[in-house]
Amino acid sequence: MPYSRDITKFITATEPEVGLPLLALQHSKSIIGVILLVICLLFILIGIIILAVGGHATAGSIFVVLSLILGGGGFFLIYKDNS
């Protein structure tokens, strides 16, 4: 069969139609991770300001918890991308 494709080319992603989207996805994961870390730092700042003003302890705690979740997700994406 002259037109059959070798399955190992798809596994190793050496063909452009397979390899390029995988490279783009890998690059975008690290960009998303950096964006999540920046949002995390912003939420920490907002949470500290809300907690410092007082009277809104629940809202401040929610921002701090959200920042921890987003920061963990961003760090995980960057870590998995570099390993």
From Swiss-Prot:
A single GO cellular-component term on record: membrane
**Which keywords does this chain's UniProt record carry?**
Late protein, Membrane, Transmembrane, Transmembrane helix, Virion
Domain of life, per the record?
A: Viruses
Induction note: Expressed in the late phase of the viral replicative cycle.
Which residue ranges traverse the bilayer? 31-51, 59-79
Chief subcellular location = virion
User: To which protein family does this belong?
Assistant: Belongs to the asfivirus EP84R family.
Protein name, UniProt field: Transmembrane protein EP84R
What organism is this sequence from? Answer: African swine fever virus (isolate Warthog/Namibia/Wart80/1980) (ASFV)
